[in-house]
């Protein structure tokens, strides 16, 4: 673990930054000055800076001595006095393409390459733009002004509204209102040839969505509508008004993360903000969720901020939960919680079952560790699920009441996790800390075994693992959330015995179910008659319960607690189901079964027959083309079904896709987005030519539609000729073709295809130093460790993975993922070796 970093706020407490930046876009340089008013507690203080040149430090117009400390991203100042004072600092720096600090985004408009300038200061990159106490606890107000080499039509945006626009016309300086007290990582700005639209919330907050001029004017409309309605919802739910005058949202062509919650100027990847009339239902829902997530942060993270990065998980877990709560409230017909059940839940359960996984709450000694510890499956998905679990345990009324008290007490200040637990405890009368500690401080989750022995119902808990592990006897405070009366509310000990099972049966209706609604973070292993009764009633269960059974039995099969072959009986039960939830659950089981299958074998023929049988009913019901007035759910079921049917060479789907391609071959971007990716994949599978590869790559370069680019990436990966692979490899290092932020998508798609796997695995190893240099500061860098761990399934690949990555475990940013990757592949290899023959035999007889 990295040594603890010094906290500069302990010697200097800033209150206000009066910051001016003069940016030379063409030269990629900037100069600036900042007057920092604050209280010095010592004669020797330190400020953060990274890659800045500090020209002077003045106090009352007198120069002060200072010492640069680049190794610690700091400089140290000698003061003649302590107390409240104002330091005036002159500095300069360079703009780089690292997507941190101040950086450019590149795009093409009318054939001309253009750029906009924007910022990314979370977690500790404000120091790349100006001297500061760059720590979340060091909240201050900001008076920000900006000058740049403007071109006609350029506009600038920041956290607050512009003031003195008449002076800008004379001086070229953009000046913005004073911000509220906030952390340095939330300051933001962007400028260039931008366009946008605005609207007002019920309480008068101005909401705006902006993008480059290369985007369609109406591409901002959907997000604007969502943002307005979500702010209205949050103000009502939290009973705390949105705290600042504006809420702007800016889509950036180059962006390391998915989005960033800068107060008043949220920044996004284009794919997570922009929607047009051809966008799919899934894309629209994803945009709505991301916008709602970032807006939740305006209260939880911005208005009230964690004291140190240890509690950053709470910001993200809370926002991840609230995105679903808010979107469900404004668009109930979407049934958006189903999206979480099919994405976040299985992601968390799979990752959290590997020995060595982190706990949700982790000590952070240095900001450099944040990306190391920021496992999205744990911090976002598991953390969100724990917040859903807590909300259900408390009840929504007490939960909302506690949040209101929390915001009112701590607004514009910093907190630790206990402060939220105290507010929720006061509102509910329950001991929240005691309930949550076992879930937050321990890695993993339990499996609850349920069985009947001699008229006694036995419930026991044990940590659930997939693969090699060390059992440390961990126990959890498990909310049973059962559909039966007469059972305890929680299971906190290792085992409980509940007598008179037959009497319980007589007093209750239906088979016993635990964790109803699937909100708590555990799975259940029903045994014997309990499983038999559950499966007998399967057809009458609600859709979430059906999904839950499929997910849990699949995980039990992954762990070896039950056979993979036993899952075929479950597929029989859901063959005719029509919901998106079940389509996704089926697809997860089918994806698991596919790992047992080698290409061009008899087993593959039988596997494809199984796939066709599972999804043929959906195709016959829905067809290939969208119907007027059909539901979003039907559209998404069609997408899932077609994706499997085309892989399984189902001829009606293959021929329909080919027909659509021919009708749009002069402009493939015009193919309806909901089936466009599948049409492109089908054409590559059928044609498999270098010419088509080149056409797809050319379309990738020229389009401004991020969703279309992702579809093209996936489609190109289905090529099966070495000439085409060599052509693609030649494009990967050209940032004008493949943006560094998207490189992992190309790698993932090609590595998952057997024909391309060897070529791309060797490419990654041979070019590792370049990948690290290009992406070392990017949040997608560890994907290059995790992606092969999620794909490889042979002993040969495991040996290669170990040989390449094990020597790199000295890199703390990679160590945990490497060690977990080894265990993940080893578990898969072991499972396939043990059950391959049984699965192939079952496929043959199916």
Regions from the PLM with identified roles:
Residues 176, 209-470, 592, 599-621, ...:
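Hydrophobic alpha-helical and helix-loop surface patches within well-folded domains
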Residues 1-245, 360, 366, 375-381, ...:
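Acidic/His-enriched low-complexity segments
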Residues 82, 139-140, 151, 170, ...:
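Short, well-ordered loop/turn elements at secondary-structure boundaries
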Residues 26-28, 136, 257-259, 704-705:
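Short glycine/serine/proline-enriched coil/turn segments at secondary-structure junctions
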Residues 99, 155-157, 184-186, 276, ...:
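Short helix/loop capping segments that flank catalytic or ligand/cofactor-binding pockets
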Residues 112, 200-204, 266-267, 354-361, ...:
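Short alpha-helical hairpin
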Residues 49, 291, 716:
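Small/polar loops that bind or transfer phosphate-bearing groups
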Residues 147, 211, 296, 363-367, ...:
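Non-catalytic accessory/interaction domains
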């Amino acid at each position: 673990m990295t040594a603890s970093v010094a906290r500069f706020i302990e010697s200097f407490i800033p209150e206000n930054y009066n910051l001016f930046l003069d940016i030379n876009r063409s030269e990629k340089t900037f100069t600036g000055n900042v007057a920092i008013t604050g209280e010095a507690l010592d004669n020797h203080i330190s400020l953060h800076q990274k890659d800045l040149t500090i020209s002077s430090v003045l106090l009352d117009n007198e120069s002060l001595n200072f010492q640069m400390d680049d190794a610690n991203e700091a400089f140290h100042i000698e003061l003649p006095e302590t107390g409240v004072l104002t330091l005036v600092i002159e500095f300069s720096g360079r703009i780089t393409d690292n997507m941190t600090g101040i950086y450019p985004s590149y795009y093409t408009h009318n054939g001309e390459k253009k750029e906009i300038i924007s910022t990314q200061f979370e977690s500790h990159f404000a120091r790349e733009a100006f001297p500061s106490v760059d720590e979340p606890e060091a909240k201050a107000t900001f008076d920000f002004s900006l000058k740049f080499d403007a071109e006609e039509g350029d506009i600038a945006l920041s956290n607050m509204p512009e003031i003195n626009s008449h002076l800008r016309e004379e001086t070229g300086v953009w000046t913005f209102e004073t911000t509220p007290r906030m952390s340095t990582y939330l300051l933001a700005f962007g400028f260039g040839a931008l366009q946008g639209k605005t609207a007002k919330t019920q309480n008068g907050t101005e909401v705006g969505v902006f993008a480059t001029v290369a985007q369609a004017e109406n591409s901002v409309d959907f997000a604007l509508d969502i943002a307005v309605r979500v702010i209205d919802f949050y103000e009502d739910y939290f009973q705390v008004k949105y705290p600042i005058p504006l809420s702007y949202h800016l889509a950036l062509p180059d962006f390391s993360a998915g989005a960033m919650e800068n107060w008043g100027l949220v920044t996004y990847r284009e794919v997570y903000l922009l929607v047009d009339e051809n966008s799919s239902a899934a894309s629209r829902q994803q945009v709505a969720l991301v916008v709602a997530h970032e807006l939740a942060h305006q209260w939880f993270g911005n208005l009230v901020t964690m004291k140190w990065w240890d509690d950053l998980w709470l910001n993200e877990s809370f926002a991840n939960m609230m995105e679903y709560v808010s979107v469900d409230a404004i668009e109930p017909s979407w049934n958006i919680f189903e999206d979480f059940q099919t994405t976040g839940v299985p992601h968390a359960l799979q990752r959290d079952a590997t020995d060595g996984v982190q706990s949700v709450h982790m000590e952070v000694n240095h900001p450099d560790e944040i990306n190391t510890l920021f496992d999205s499956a744990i911090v976002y998905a598991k953390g969100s699920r724990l917040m859903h679990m807590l909300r259900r345990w408390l009840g929504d009324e007490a939960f909302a009441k506690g949040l209101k008290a929390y915001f009112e007490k701590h607004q514009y200040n910093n907190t630790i996790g206990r402060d939220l637990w105290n507010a929720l405890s006061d509102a509910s009368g329950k001991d929240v800390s005691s309930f949550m500690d076992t879930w937050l401080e321990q890695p993993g989750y339990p499996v609850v075994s349920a069985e009947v022995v001699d008229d006694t119902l036995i419930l026991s808990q044990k940590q659930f693992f997939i693969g090699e592990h060390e059992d440390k006897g961990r126990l959890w405070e498990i909310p049973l959330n059962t559909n039966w009366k007469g059972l305890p509310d929680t299971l906190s000990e290792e085992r409980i015995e509940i007598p008179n099972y037959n009497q319980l049966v007589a007093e209750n209706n239906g088979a016993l179910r635990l964790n109803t609604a699937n909100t708590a973070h555990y799975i259940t292993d029903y045994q014997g008659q309990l499983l038999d009764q559950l499966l007998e009633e399967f057809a009458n269960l609600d859709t979430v319960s059906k999904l839950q059974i499929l997910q849990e039995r699949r995980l039990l099969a992954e762990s070896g607690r039950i056979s993979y072959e036993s899952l075929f009986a479950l597929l029989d039960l859901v063959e005719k189901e029509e919901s998106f939830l079940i389509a996704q659950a089926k697809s997860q089981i089918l994806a698991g079964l596919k790992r047992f299958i080698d290409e061009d074998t008899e087993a593959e023929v039988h596997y494809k027959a199984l796939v066709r049988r599972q999804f043929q009913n959906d195709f016959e019901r829905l067809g290939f083309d969208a119907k007027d007035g059909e539901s979003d759910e039907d559209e998404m079921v069609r997408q899932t079904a077609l994706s499997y049917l085309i892989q399984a060479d189902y001829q009606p789907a293959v021929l329909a896709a080919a027909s659509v391609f021919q009708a749009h071959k002069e402009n493939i971007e015009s193919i309806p987005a909901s089936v466009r990716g599948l049409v492109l994949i089908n054409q590559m599978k059928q044609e498999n030519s270098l010419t088509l590869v080149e056409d797809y790559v050319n379309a990738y370069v020229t389009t401004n539609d991020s969703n279309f680019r992702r579809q093209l990436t996936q489609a190109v990966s289905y090529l099966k000729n070495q000439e085409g692979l060599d052509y693609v490899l030649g494009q990967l290092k050209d940032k004008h073709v493949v943006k560094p932020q998207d490189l992992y998508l190309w790698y993932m798609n090609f590595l998952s295809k057997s024909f391309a796997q060897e070529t791309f695995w060797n490419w990654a190893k041979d070019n590792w130093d370049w990948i690290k240099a290009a992406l070392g500061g990017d949040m997608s860098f560890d994907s290059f460790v995790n992606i092969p761990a999620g794909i490889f399934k042979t002993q040969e690949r495991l040996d290669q993975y170990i040989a390449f990555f094990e020597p790199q475990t000295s890199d703390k940013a990679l160590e945990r993922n490497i060690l977990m990757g080894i265990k993940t592949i080893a578990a898969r290899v072991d499972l396939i070796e043990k059950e391959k023959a049984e699965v192939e035999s079952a496929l043959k007889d199916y």
